[in-house]
Amino acid sequence: MNKIRKGDEVIVLTGKDKGKRGTVQAVLGDKVAVEGVNVAKKHARPNPMLGTTGGVVDKVMPLHISNVALVDANGKPSRVGIKVEDGKRVRVLKTTGAVVAA
């Protein structure tokens, strides 16, 4: 079970974007793509088959999953634990003990 999933609100703990918040767009193995964080400029070629124009495009680059943490209700970063409730495994915030919505 992944502790961080698509759609989770996270905060960046380290790096040039430290302190920024965003929503997880994708989980790629041990990396996550966070909306508006770690944005790089990529040069795109025009493709007439797809109808795309060329130019410089902003692209969200993935961060390592250990460099982000879920945000609790108080707006603080929190680690995530796994707990069994009613025979199901649920994610629990370590700071508040609240269950994270699936």
Curated annotation (Swiss-Prot):
Signal peptide: none annotated. Keywords: Ribonucleoprotein, Ribosomal protein, RNA-binding, rRNA-binding. One of its GO terms (molecular function) is rRNA binding. GO terms for cellular component: ribonucleoprotein complex; ribosome. PROSITE patterns: RIBOSOMAL_L24. It comes from the Bacteria. GO terms for biological process: translation. InterPro entries: KOW (IPR005824), Rib_uL2_dom2 (IPR014722), Ribosomal_uL24 (IPR003256), Ribosomal_uL24_CS (IPR005825), Ribosomal_uL24_KOW (IPR041988), Translation_prot_SH3-like_sf (IPR008991). HAMAP family: Ribosomal_uL24_B. Belongs to the universal ribosomal protein uL24 family. Part of the 50S ribosomal subunit. One of two assembly initiator proteins, it binds directly to the 5'-end of the 23S rRNA, where it nucleates assembly of the 50S subunit. This is Large ribosomal subunit protein uL24. It comes from Cupriavidus pinatubonensis (strain JMP 134 / LMG 1197) (Cupriavidus necator (strain JMP 134)). The lineage of its organism: Bacteria, Pseudomonadati, Pseudomonadota, Betaproteobacteria, Burkholderiales.
